Amino acid sequence: IVQSICEGGDDGAPAATKVDSITGQVYNILMVFIKIIGVIFLLHIFLLVFQYTIAALFVHRNPFKLLGKMMPAYFTALGTQSSAATIPVTLRQTVKNGVTEDIAGFVIPLCATIHLSGSTLKIVACALALMIMQGMPFDFPMFAGFIFMLGITMVAAPGVPGGAIMAALGILASMLGFGESEQALMIALYIAMDSFGTACNVTGDGAIALIIDKFFGKKDLRPIQ
């Protein structure tokens, strides 16, 4: 079989040369994808630091200590890839951050469904990178409208592995002009780093709970663990 492959293709060119060419293209694409994943991971870190910095301004506490207490939820989400499955851990760590149980019990399950900031960031970044790679035209108004509609769509996206990208396929096609091949690449890119997006989502839920608790929580005298 190997000999027949190496003897040549339909046009007489050595098949081994074709295989090398395809392998080189795949390698280049994979390198680009790895760079995209790295950039998005850094953006997720920046987003979490930003969210907890804002929350810290309301509660007057160290944002990095607040973020550090949410790390069990972050690492649990890396494994489950599901916001819904991580709710018990997220809820426990949010209470440890000083949020009252009533507020945490309301905000965390709700945000597991409607707060998908990490997934939204990831979809926008992947879509932009793919359009640049494919030479597709784009401009700021197009992406502004896409981000607005994506934010609404993410409210309806299920908190399960791959739920966000599947919910976003419609607007990727209608607003950005993605065909079947582009949508397939988006799904592949998204699934490859789904765990990081989910971890960003659930960890950010704790920051929202802190802000809501500041305004509506009934504080008790229990020490913060």
Regions found by a protein language model. Give the residues of each.
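Membrane-water interface at transmembrane helix exits
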Residues: 2-6, 51, 55-59, 95, ...
